[in-house]
A protein has these predicted regions:
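A structural signal for conserved, well-ordered secondary-structure elements
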Residues: 1-759
């Protein structure tokens, strides 16, 4: 292929890529299934209990109940509802974009168990006697009053029932919906608004399969009630008792505002990454921008393909993935720069870097996969969305940042147009050696030669131990400020166009017949408020408070309620997630490198986790489920940085082959850190830029999540440089002292020329 044809191929491919994305991006964005926190709606987790004593809740009963709930949801007209059966006796319902949340929740939890009883409250007919789908809301011809009509399966049975009632002294046929133990017709008949729907006198047997319920419906509200009863009867009754043990509702405006802010923050973060890559890496940086844009597009396409639900943490994961994709590019570009500095041509440097960087990228991303997989397995809906996006992002990193980026760069490199333009790859001519000098990439001088990381690590490890001890004391004294996800209770978030005052919020809570345990006013110009209750509010209390807030402040609030049972489970799952992620990482690193590297990596990770926990404890920052997602992300991301350094340690061990002195170990540690320092700084800078943008411009609801990421990223860079690798060096020195003849053979070359690291 001629020089010009490669450039033409590059330009044509880029034009096709961007033309394809430009033509379809609107439909891709339109088809993104937004979660509750981005478009409003609600999520309820029901505990399914037997309605009658002695009944059992088995798999069949759960599936039947889920089907009935789905029928009711279809009546509400909600697009793409999610109804999931969860073992052993739970059903999760997610309705995004539902307009009347109160009505929807009432419709879902109602048993819709219609019974026809006599005046002594004895059951004569039940919902099982009604023909499926026969219920209608109609109007009486004479009075135009709303009614509900339905047909019975057996008209002879209905005739027999009406005949029996007609012969009684108190000859009324009472229609009940969801009759409860203790309910009584005679008591309710004395009230202005009785619980039963209607009570009609029966003077003679009715020889018909049609039943009409009337008298209990008046005006427009009566029409609405009659229509709802008809729809519930057609959807089917629930032969079980549903108890809400977790609920989360978000107002549409609240969700839209969160989406707008986070998208804006993400745009700023990604734009700054693009500028950095172009300024620091120049021509390869331009290729990286093309690959990163494709990465965002393809990740969203894949997310739509698997029908993923995009939540706020999921959106953050998408942007965080951009930082991780940048890392894959930076690893390769730094390798290219090293190869250019020892005197190789651009084409040779590209070829060599292409081979040497792949395994490093693979290893570093696989550890993040472990953390994301654990998050997906143990997390609830919003955390699952985060984990799903993270897993897809890592897959797309290999598609775009590895394969697409390399292919595009190979077209430019092989064209030879940039043959001697080393500055376009970020390397000055006076920094290049002659290839005949025989300089190895591992012998190149860096900007950090004056830094003795082994010497610096000793006092810094001491400082870290001191921080851990102080952190333990802080944790013991202050404890963690657990959010309702773990402590149970109810949290209400809302915003207003006007400044909110403590007194106004207190009054609204008081008017709702409640007493708040904590009220916080925050946000720009005090326009955001958070109200917390230690008790989990009932649905009726939720509804009343929501209506009062909307009336006073003009915003439908986000209400999150967690029962003590769920709070305990979430806390348990959070601990298990952290333990399993750590075990998975230590096993993988031990297999790919050595157990000392795995152990020192996990100790560094635990240090990062503890730093985040200690800071959150000291400053009384609330810990919720997204905090756990942030911690596990740091676990996966911090190990990413550590593995890149350990990969360079492995290369340096390969060069040394045999270790006989502790000075050699110190030298390997120092050189490995120095050689990967630029990559570490550049990578963390690109990710921190995104995190800081979301921290300052993103939605308030993910502020704590983003803050935990920010603290973890800073701590992660510190621990990978001053804890993980130096700790490995300390353990390696002990191994050397205990070894026979005071000698360690760390590398042997097989006859097949395959590498073999002995550690």
């Amino acid at each position: 292929m001629k020089k010009s044809s490669r450039i033409i191929a590059f330009l044509l491919l880029v034009v096709l890529l961007f033309a394809g994305m430009a033509a379809t991006y609107k439909s891709v964005i339109k088809n993104v299934n937004l979660g509750l926190d981005l478009q409003g709606g609600f999520e309820v987790l029901y505990q399914v209990d037997p309605l009658n004593k002695g009944d059992k809740i088995d798999k069949k009963a759960l599936q039947s109940t889920a089907q009935t709930l789905e029928n009711r949801v279809n009546v509400l007209g909600v697009s793409e509802p999610k109804i999931q059966v969860e073992e052993p006796n739970r059903i999760r319902v997610q309705l995004a974009g539902v307009t009347d949340q109160n009505e929807a929740r009432k419709s879902l939890s109602s048993q819709a168990n219609l019974t026809i009883r006599d005046a002594e409250d004895k059951v004569k007919l039940s919902g099982s006697d009604i023909k499926q789908g026969s219920a209608k809301q109609e109007f009486k011809q004479e009075t135009n009053q709303p009614t509900v009509t339905f047909k019975v399966k057996d008209k002879n049975k209905f005739k027999k029932v009406t005949e029996e009632i007609s012969k009684k002294r108190d000859n009324v046929m009472v229609v009940w919906l969801d009759f409860k133990k203790g309910d009584s017709y005679k008591k309710e008949a004395q009230k202005k608004n009785p619980k039963f729907i209607s009570a009609a006198s029966v003077d003679q047997p009715i020889n018909s399969d049609s039943v009409e319920i009337s008298g209990g419906f008046k005006g427009q509200e009566g029409v609405k009630k009659a229509k709802q009863i008809a729809e519930l009867l057609n959807a089917g009754s629930l032969p079980v008792d549903l108890k809400e043990i977790y609920s989360n509702s978000v107002g549409a405006q609240f969700g839209q505002d969160a989406l707008d802010k986070t998208v804006f923050a993400s745009f700023i973060g990604v734009a700054l990454i693009y500028l950095f890559m172009l300024g620091f890496y120049r021509l390869p940086g331009l290729v990286a921008i093309i690959a990163l844009t494709t990465y965002i597009y393809l990740t969203l396409v894949a997310f739509n393909f698997i029908s993923g639900v995009l939540t706020l943490p999921g959106l953050a994961a998408l942007v965080l993935g951009v930082g991780m994709a940048v890392d894959a590019n930076i690893i390769m570009y730094e390798r290219i720069k090293d190869e250019l500095r020892i005197g190789r041509t651009i084409k040779q440097a590209f070829s060599k870097a292409n081979k040497s960087s792949f395994l490093t990228i693979f290893d570093s991303n696989l550890t993040t996969v472990i953390a994301a997989a654990v998050l997906f397995f143990f997390g609830e809906s919003s955390v699952k969305g985060f984990a799903t996006m993270l897993l897809l992002g890592i897959l797309m990193i290999f598609v775009t940042a590895v394969f697409l980026s390399r292919f595009l760069l190979s077209l430019l490199v092989s064209s030879n147009i940039f043959k001697n333009q080393f500055w376009l790859f970020g390397v000055k001519k006076n920094k290049r050696h002659d290839i005949n000098e025989g300089v190895d990439v591992h012998d190149l001088k860096t900007s950090f030669e004056k830094w003795n990381f082994v010497k610096l690590a000793k006092p810094l490890i001491g400082v870290s131990i001191l921080i851990v001890v102080v952190g333990l004391v802080i944790l013991y004294i202050f404890k963690l400020n657990l959010g309702i996800d773990f402590s149970s209770g109810t949290r209400v978030d809302f915003q207003s166009k006007q400044a909110i005052t403590q007194q106004k919020v207190e009054q609204v809570v008081k008017d709702s017949g409640l007493k708040a345990d904590q009220i916080q006013i925050n946000g720009k110009d005090n326009k955001v408020a958070t109200v917390q209750f230690k008790d989990d509010l009932t649905r009726a209390q939720d509804n009343k408070l929501s209506d009062n807030i909307k009336s006073k402040f003009g915003d439908t609030p986000q209400i999150n309620t967690v029962s003590p049972i769920i709070g305990q489970e979430l806390a348990k799952n959070a601990m298990l997630a952290l333990i399993y992620a750590s075990i998975g990482i230590i096993i993988y690193v031990s297999l790919r490198f050595e157990w000392r590297m795995g152990l020192s990596s996990v100790l560094a990770l635990l240090h990062d986790v503890f730093i985040i926990v200690a800071i959150f404890s000291l400053f009384r920052i609330e810990v919720d489920l997204t905090f756990i997602a942030a911690v596990l992300t740091i676990v996966g991301y911090s190990i990413n940085d550590t593995i890149v350094t350990f990969d360079r340690v492995r290369e340096n061990l390969q060069k040394v082959k045999v270790i006989t002195t502790t000075e050699q170990i110190d030298d390997i540690v120092n050189r490995s850190i120095r050689q990967t320092m630029t990559r570490s700084i550049n990578t963390v800078l690109t990710v921190i830029v995104v995190v800081v943008a979301i921290l300052f411009f993103g939605a308030p609801t993910i502020f704590n999540f983003t803050l935990a990421l920010f603290i973890g990223l800073i701590s992660g860079v510190f621990s990978s440089i001053f804890i993980a690798v130096p700790l490995w060096g300390i353990m390696k020195k002990r191994q050397l002292k205990k070894s026979p003849k005071h000698k360690l053979v760390v590398y042997k070359e097989k006859k097949s020329n395959d590498e073999k690291i002995l550690v």
